[in-house]
């Protein structure tokens, strides 16, 4: 028998729109299209004034305002599940306790490594970094000022994770965690999270953007222009190509000036800046290949499955979750992360093997339809919600955190 659910979805979005925001919106659209009721509380980091960033980091430990907001919403409706996509920094873990007060199951999607790493990426100074992974107090991150380049702000973030680790929030106030890949699940288990509270469910692309034909012939990069995304490696690889080929770059970020300067000297490379989702889908469908050169442990790499949905194969770093998302030599190619020479070699392969690339287009689209489209993904999400509800019924109610404990 069909059982429609009533879900309260929470998400704190960043100042620059990214994959987490699109993934949250896709799940909301998917659930509603499947007949479930979804209400949202969406907070945007644009509310943060630069002069208050340290204060906001401190507030991330416990936001009474967010607790009251969720408490009030739960009193007004009969919700089955509180699904938190990202609570940092304005919502805070206080929202879990509001749900516990009302006996509502809590699900947290692990869209980043915030609970394991103050700077969220497990990446520092151009290299992977796991110094804080298993530590209750993330003192290496504090020493390096990993959050916004500030030791004080990093200490505030580290205090949040340490406080809630010691209090038992991650263990007792969340009924179920959704990891996007087995790699992410394993990382959180390595950091001490209980394996029986971690399930794997990938991102979804909904609605279906439709399959393109790759007739534009260009290569495409879509993402934040920042060091961990590997855009510098991509530009170095492009300089090594032995023939002319157009590269289109979509996105913005701290490396925007570098990309702009590179484009001024290399007419085959075009920086388009940020673009709306519908336009990005069209660009993907017309591309010969999408390049995903990330140098951090992507929790998923959403743009890869968006590309698969349009039938466009992907060249991705052989790193972390990216090894799981596609199938090498069927939906794209993998290269050694940070190795511009290897990436250039893979780009040449795409140019030299048009028939195989056409076959990859078919397989990429098929993979999307079987693994990343709506029906299977929604089934897995509902199963996760039902698992969380069972766990919630067995859990002891938790009231509001008393001020003397803070």
Region spans (language model):
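A conserved mid-protein helix/loop that constitutes part of the nucleotide-sugar donor-binding site
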Residues: 21-22, 217, 221-240, 254-258, ...
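Short alpha-helical donor nucleotide-sugar binding micro-motif in glycosyltransferases
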Residues: 74, 274-275, 282-287
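Donor nucleotide-sugar binding/catalytic pocket of nucleotide-sugar-dependent glycosyltransferases
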Residues: 115, 130, 134-210, 270
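Nucleotide-activated donor-binding/catalytic signature segment of Leloir-type glycosyltransferases, i.e.
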Residues: 257-278
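Acidic donor-binding loop of glycosyltransferase active sites
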Residues: 285-299, 312
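Short acidic/histidine- and often glycine-rich active-site loop of Leloir-type glycosyltransferases
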Residues: 305, 319-329, 333-334
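Conserved acidic donor-binding segment of nucleotide-sugar-dependent glycosyltransferases
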Residues: 328-329, 333-340, 349-354
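A short, well-ordered alpha-helix in the C-terminal region of glycosyltransferases
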Residues: 342, 349, 356-371, 377-383
